[in-house]
Amino acid sequence: MDSTSSLHGSSLHRPSTEQTRTDFSWDGINLSMEDTTSILPKLKRNSNAYGIGALAKSSFSGISRSMKDHVTKPTAMGQGRVAHMIEWQGWGKAPAIQPQHSHEAVRRDTDAYSDLSDGEKEARFLAGVMEQFAISEATLMAWSSMDGEDMSVNSTQEPLDCNYSDNYQELMESQDALAQAPMDGWPHSYVSQGMYCLGSSDAWEASDQSLIASPATGSYLGPAFDDSQPSLHDMGPSQPASGYSAQEPPPLLGVDTDWASEVGGVELARGPVEEEKRPLAPEEEEDAGCRDLESLSPREDPEMSTALSRKVSDVTSSGVQSFDEEEGDANN
């Protein structure tokens, strides 16, 4: 009786979940193990939720299959017919007929399409699909070919740029070698020949700051001077070059003029007073030629100027050594 009363109580209070829980908790105290078998049908009934989900899923798949068979296929055929009409009527193209006959042409085309059999309609549908696929495939192939051409152009431009840079570097190196070759021979050749423009006092004026810096920055007589002026051998001993004869060495900086005149027998310029007494026409011409050649000569780098100054100092030191040898011979 207790079990039946508890079952009836639970059935009466079933709409309220909280009350059923309290009833179950209250009745569970008085329930025995034999009476628990009456709860199993409820648990089994609650476990059918998975079965309901599977049924809903299967029913949904069945409904979707039926919709596909009865709704989707006819709709696809209808869309295909619309596509056939678009292809048949030639929409998107320039009208080849007059506007007043357009309605008649559309009606005629519609009647002609409707008169086609199902096989002809299917054939036209497949032809339209194949045409669209062919157009899209051709477009993709064109794009891929354009991408390939761009890649090939870029790949060909890279080695061209590398070759251009290599050739440019080789050209610059050859130009540097050509520029250094004549400059290496300038101090030895022109200083030994007495053509280094240091004999005139005008070359060392305080106003010309570029010539005061060092003898290496002085102007050399280049090939243009050989063409415009007579050579040292043609001038002879009577005509001095840069204020001195061809056999006489140029004056050395820092050497006493009296000692140099006694040892080498060289008549050095005593100053601007003696230069004013004799005619200055040849010296002025030579100074003008030196300055013109200096303006035409290329600017030297600091490294090149230091190298040239060292070479000039070597030449001058060799000249001092030769003067010492001559002095020793004269004393003996």
Swiss-Prot record:
Phosphoserine PTM sites in chain numbering: 47, 114, 117, 295, 297, 313, 317-318, 322
Keyword Mitochondrion recorded: no
Keyword Phosphoprotein: yes
Residue list for modification Phosphothreonine: 316
Basic and acidic residues composition bias: residue spans: 272-281, 288-302
Compositionally biased region (Acidic residues): 323-332
Region (Disordered): 1-22, 221-332
Keywords, comma-separated and alphabetical: Phosphoprotein
UniProt cross-references to InterPro entries, sorted A to Z: FAM131
Superkingdom of origin: Eukaryota
Family stated for the protein in its record: Belongs to the FAM131 family.
Protein name: Protein FAM131B
Taxonomic source organism: Rattus norvegicus (Rat)
